[in-house]
């Protein structure tokens, strides 16, 4: 990597694997006569559905080169991973063997659905599978323009500034941004400990990115060593081991991670700017969430993030304006990969994209330990990116 360049890496829904090294599982299969195919498949779908292998085609068809006849092979059911005995087939499946002249054997099929055409081509060499390219198009998955990259890097600089300025030890920081107008909606740091007094979250200010002058980067994360103990997402249970000032117990809370506080700040802002409850979105009438939905509209200036603007946002709103629904369409920038709790909170808030600088190898929820963006059962999915901060770029920021 160029030591003077910022690099933005997409973190996919599942770990990257070589197309020719796909995980497989064992299944019982058998050649079948074409005239029995429909009947056998109908029985198998009832008694042995392949719920976890929906990407795998139940029947494999092959044209025999010698005679041109069609050869059909059907998956009967899953097989035990550590046992190759045909007698372990479920009784309901075994009852199909004699009537339909089956000859069961054990073979392999790919465990996961392909996420690229290259993976699908390799999978089909083992057993035919289905491939469904993503139907959504989140900005950035296919790469960023130079202008977008600069904007992302500037917001990440705000995160670094917040994390290192006035905090000993280092804390995590979160900045929620409306990408449609490149404005900061909320910016907060960890408030798990009493030393991190909560900020006033009733301000109606929504501000564009501003140059913040010198950023005090005394050291990179790699050199912080023991100073990482206060990063709430890195050590979710560390708070329980620390002494707390009971007289100021209202100033700390074990769940006040940077992401959670930023969400609270964004909500307080919305309540202040859109006080009329009749204009609030009815959750029952919100359109289905999808990852390419536009950022929710705000009454904000569309100025460039480089333009200085110290004025507060107008608190008097057009009566026709409706209160936005949560954080739909927003981006969030974090110093550290969020823990599972914070990652799930960002799902509920309908965040569109997450950018973080450093992986969370102990409790990360977006790639390092868990991978929440790949959980199919969730009703919303965001795109996740890691922003690599080379040392040269960090040193350059200290001289702005």
Swiss-Prot record:
Q: Which GO terms describe its biological process?
A: tRNA modification
Kindly indicate whether the keyword Zinc belongs to this entry: yes
Q: Which InterPro entries match?
A: Cytidine_deaminase-like
Enzyme Commission number: 3.5.4.33
Q: Which domain of life does the protein's organism represent?
A: Eukaryota
Q: Which GO terms describe its molecular function?
A: metal ion binding; tRNA-specific adenosine deaminase activity; tRNA-specific adenosine-34 deaminase activity
Question: Mind telling me which GO cellular component terms the entry cites?
Answer: cytoplasm; nucleus
Q: What is its main location?
A: nucleus
Q: Which residues bind Zn(2+)?
A: 257, 339, 342
Matching entries from SUPFAM superfamilies are given as: Cytidine deaminase-like
Region listing for Disordered, in residue ranges: 273-320
* Keyword Hydrolase appears in the UniProt entry: yes
Keywords for the protein's UniProt record, in alphabetical order: Cytoplasm, Hydrolase, Metal-binding, Nucleus, tRNA processing, Zinc
Q: What assembly does the database describe for this protein?
A: Interacts with TAD2.
Identification of the protein by name: tRNA-specific adenosine deaminase TAD3
The source organism is Arabidopsis thaliana (Mouse-ear cress)
Organism ancestry: Eukaryota, Viridiplantae, Streptophyta, Embryophyta, Tracheophyta
């Amino acid at each position: 990597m160029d030591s003077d360049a910022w690099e933005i890496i997409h973190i996919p829904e599942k770990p990257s694997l070589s197309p020719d090294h796909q995980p497989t599982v064992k299944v019982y299969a058998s050649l079948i006569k074409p005239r029995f195919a429909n009947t056998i498949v109908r029985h198998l779908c009832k008694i042995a559905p392949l719920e976890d292998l929906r990407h795998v085609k139940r029947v494999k068809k092959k044209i025999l080169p010698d005679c041109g006849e069609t050869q059909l092979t059907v998956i009967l059911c899953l097989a035990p991973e550590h046992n190759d005995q045909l007698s372990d087939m479920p009784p309901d499946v075994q009852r199909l063997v004699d009537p339909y002249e089956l000859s069961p054997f054990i073979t392999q099929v790919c465990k996961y659905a392909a996420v690229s055409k290259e993976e699908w081509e390799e999978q089909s060499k083992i057993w035919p599978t289905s491939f469904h390219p993503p139907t959504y198009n989140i900005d950035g998955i296919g790469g960023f323009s130079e202008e977008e990259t600069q904007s992302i890097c500037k917001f990440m600089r705000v995160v670094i500034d917040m994390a290192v300025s006035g905090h000993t030890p280092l804390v995590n920081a979160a900045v929620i941004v409306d990408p449609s107008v490149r404005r900061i909606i909320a910016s907060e740091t960890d408030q798990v400990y009493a030393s991190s007094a909560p900020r006033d979250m009733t301000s109606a200010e929504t501000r564009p990115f501003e140059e913040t002058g010198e950023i005090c980067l005394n050291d990179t994360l790699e050199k912080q060593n023991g100073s990482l103990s206060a990063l709430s997402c890195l050590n979710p249970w560390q708070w329980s081991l620390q002494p707390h000032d009971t007289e100021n117990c209202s100033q700390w809370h074990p769940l006040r991670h940077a992401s959670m506080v930023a969400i609270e700040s964004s909500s307080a802002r919305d309540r202040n700017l859109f006080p009329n409850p009749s204009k609030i979105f009815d959750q029952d009438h919100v359109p289905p969430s999808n990852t390419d939905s536009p950022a929710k509209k705000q009454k904000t200036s569309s100025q460039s993030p480089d333009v200085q603007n110290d004025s507060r946002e107008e608190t008097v709103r057009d009566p026709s304006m409706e209160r936005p629904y949560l954080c739909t369409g927003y981006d969030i920038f974090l110093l550290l990969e969020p823990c599972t709790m914070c990652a799930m909170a960002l799902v509920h808030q309908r965040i569109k994209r997450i950018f973080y600088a450093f992986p969370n190898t102990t409790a990360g929820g977006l790639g390092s330990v868990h991978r929440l963006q790949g959980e199919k059962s969730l009703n919303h999915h965001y795109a996740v990116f890691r922003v690599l901060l080379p040392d040269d770029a960090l040193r350059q920021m200290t001289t702005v």
